[in-house]
Regions:
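Short, flexible helix-to-coil linker/hinge segments that flank and couple to helix-turn-helix
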Residues: 70-74, 80-125, 187-188
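Two-component/phosphorelay signaling modules centered on CheY-like receiver
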Residues: 1-10
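Basic, Lys/Arg-enriched C-terminal extension of HTH/homeodomain DNA-binding domains
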Residues: 168-198
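Recognition helix of helix-turn-helix DNA-binding domains
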Residues: 143-178
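Short amphipathic alpha-helix used as the core "switch/output" element in two-component signaling
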Residues: 43-55
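The feature encodes the CheY-like receiver
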Residues: 38
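Acidic catalytic/metal-coordinating carboxylates
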Residues: 14, 41-44
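Active-site residues of response regulator receiver
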Residues: 34-35, 62
Length: 198
């Protein structure tokens, strides 16, 4: 049974496949994003998609359905949050609401609870990053060196150094390690899956 009758559904097994699909297809109306999708570290994928494709609504689908995760997803620009434990009917309802311009979250979640002013300030800094800077920060969080990041992104090492400098300035920190710590604070333990190497 199709969740959305008459819809064309494309699937991506990893975040890189998703971004390639978004670059290739111009008629995508909605993205369902799993926070634990390969290639994503917590909210980094959501932040990247909202920066790169602001016109395409993103609905987070996740097994992590605590109030804090849902609130942070919405703060970072998700149009909805659907816990994986919900059935097809709920998924259909949520997608319908989002496609009509509304937002959807579980009714038992208070989106205004637990807002930490310090976290809000850090979040505000993080969302000033460009999509490429978000990608670089994701890779820094994985412990990659500038040379490795440059190779992965197909740019020069000097370009990566410039991105890292801009990231440090925008986040108000002095080192790569501090930038990764800020990113980890913003999304709890969900931003970073691997500790950066020394």
């Amino acid at each position: 049974m199709s969740v959305v009758p008459a819809a064309n559904i494309d699937e991506a097994g990893a975040f890189g496949e998703l971004t390639a699909l978004l670059e290739k297809e111009s008629d995508i109306d909605l993205v369902l994003l799993d926070l634990s999708m390969p290639g994503v570290s917590g909210f980094s994928g959501l932040i990247y998609l909202r920066a790169q494709y602001p016109a395409i609504p993103v609905v987070v689908v996740s097994a992590s359905d605590d109030g804090d995760t849902i609130r942070r997803s919405m703060e970072f620009g998700a149009s909805g949050f659907i816990p994986k434990r919900f059935g097809v009917e709920t998924l259909r309802e949520a997608i319908g609401k989002v496609m009509n311009g509304d937002v959807w979250t579980p009714s038992d979640v208070d989106l205004s609870a637990g807002v930490d002013p310090d976290m809000a300030k850090l979040r505000d800094r993080l969302i000033t990053l460009t999509p490429q800077q978000v990608r670089v920060l994701m890779m820094l969080s994985e412990g990659l060196l500038n040379k490795q990041i440059a190779y992965e992104l197909g740019v020069s090492e000097a370009t990566i150094k410039a991105h890292v400098s801009a990231i440090l300035q925008k986040l108000g920190v002095e080192s790569r390690t501090q930038a990764v710590i800020v990113a980890a604070k913003i999304s709890g333990n969900q931003w970073r899956q691997n500790e950066p190497s020394a």
